[in-house]
């Protein structure tokens, strides 16, 4: 088992061990993931504030289907012009209602979006790895588990919260029904599947003001592993 639970001191693997820095050369590549509304964006922001280079796959997935892109043209070809709003931009709500209810539709969308996002992410990753000094590159990937990418990273960090709290957050954030929130959760990998690939588990059920303590602890261990690897 490869796990460090930062939230409650349960540790089965020490983050500061040198074998966490598989990439060597002064770079640690972190795969950050978790279910919908599990706090990934908050954790990603906090890691960025501590010096990590953040590659936000959600943002990239929006960029590659912006107005005028080939990605948007492919989406319209696959799903029709009803997924556009009046100004020609993507109607994410309309598209979401299609793909969350239909596995085959979701796979068609992923086949369009994922290669474009991967190309963009690779460019950012290469630029970060070419920089001088010690670098932590965080790939914030909502579908890391679903796409089987855990082994690509030196550290896999999972944001974890009870599913009932996920539902509450989704309903509050998006104004959808509980049924819709549950459908979105069930469309992703399960909580157990996320935890199974985790090297580090961040407990995001804690009050927001308590979360930086967890981030500081894992950041110091990853940074310590980097320094150890450089000696």
From Swiss-Prot:
Gene Ontology cellular component list: cytoplasm
Entry's EC annotation: 2.7.1.24
Binding residues annotated for ATP, in chain numbering: 37-42
GO MF annotations in UniProt: ATP binding; dephospho-CoA kinase activity
Catalytic reaction annotation: 3'-dephospho-CoA + ATP = ADP + CoA + H(+)
Subcellular location: Cytoplasm
UniProt-listed GO biological process terms: coenzyme A biosynthetic process
SUPFAM superfamilies: P-loop containing nucleoside triphosphate hydrolases
Main location: cytoplasm
Domain of life where this protein originates: Bacteria
Pfam assignment, any one: CoaE
Pathway: Cofactor biosynthesis; coenzyme A biosynthesis; CoA from (R)-pantothenate: step 5/5
Coiled-coil stretches: none
DPCK domain boundaries: 29-231
Keyword list, A-Z: ATP-binding, Coenzyme A biosynthesis, Cytoplasm, Kinase, Nucleotide-binding, Transferase
The protein's role, per its UniProt record: Catalyzes the phosphorylation of the 3'-hydroxyl group of dephosphocoenzyme A to form coenzyme A.
Family, per entry: Belongs to the CoaE family.
Protein name: Dephospho-CoA kinase
UniProt source species: Cutibacterium acnes (strain DSM 16379 / KPA171202)
Upper classification of the organism: Bacteria, Bacillati, Actinomycetota, Actinomycetes, Propionibacteriales
GN (gene name): coaE
